[in-house]
Amino acid sequence: MDHTFSNRLLLVPLFQGFSRLDFLDIVEKTPFDFRTLKPKEIVVRQGDESHRLCILLGGEVECESESPEHTYRIKENIRAPWVMQPDCLFGLHNVYRYTVRSLVESQFVMLDKQSVRRLLMQYPAFQINFYNMLS
């Protein structure tokens, strides 16, 4: 197992509070999709459907939200570690509320919705951390 990856993942609030065995079990059994994005690459667009949980492990992104009337935009810069819009993954309106664009070379790990659902069912610590992020 790559210790750099596991150390970065442990900094993410979703993965805090796990026993070493549970954490190793998660890393072993969960299909993580790793991506490195170049500056100005778009991660997700506002209005697109959310099919996966995106976690920024390294780098910096810009979040841009446009009003429904297209009269104004709000931009915010966010650095790693960060879990991107977890509230959009499940629920009535599972679309992204803002566009996320990489500002510098950034490392992401993506978890599909099915994997997140499995983690929520099997690991109480993950479930508590996920609910804390939503509140």
Q: How should each PLM-predicted stretch be described?
A:
Residues 26, 64, 86-87, 118-119, ...:
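Residues that scaffold the ATP/ADP-binding catalytic core of kinase and kinase-like folds
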Residues 41-104:
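Cyclic nucleotide-binding regulatory domains
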Residues 1-38, 88-91:
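Cyclic nucleotide-binding regulatory module and flanking cytosolic helices
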Residues 106-115:
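A short hydrophobic beta-strand segment most commonly corresponding to one strand
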Residues 23, 95-99, 114-135:
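A small-molecule sensor/coupling module
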Residues 39, 79-80, 112, 134:
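A secondary-structure boundary/capping signal
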